[in-house]
Amino acid sequence: MSQPELRDNRRVILDGQPQVRFRAAGQLFDRIPLANLSHGGCLAIIPFQEAGALCLDTPVTELVIFHPGMTANPITARVAWTIAHAEGDQVAVGLQFNDMAHDTRIALVAVVDSAILESAKR
């Protein structure tokens, strides 16, 4: 049996190689691949050996998304969840956005909505 969808926002997979940079738990995570993005958060894929300090509700600062159309203004967020299937695997880290500048919000909505429209055409 599958779990009901609890997320509030539709996730999209972006073209290209979107990445994110952020600080959390006293560490800088730089050029981390993004698996998906939404109006409310993103899914980062972090090497197991680097992700150990990230647990539920860890504050995230200075988050910047590297993708055409996004601004370089930092976003604050929190770790919403993490999952790794086995030691040594990469860790999927769900980040929930808390606060961002108005122009960053506008850019984020435009990027996500554009990806949704493109996927609907396929």
Predicted regions and their residues:
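N-terminal helix initiation/capping motif
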Residues: M1-F48, V109-R122
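Hydrophobic core residues within well-ordered beta-strands of beta-rich domains
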Residues: L14, N73-I75, V91
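Short glycine/serine/proline-enriched coil/turn segments at secondary-structure junctions
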Residues: G26, A53-L54, M70-T71, H85-E87
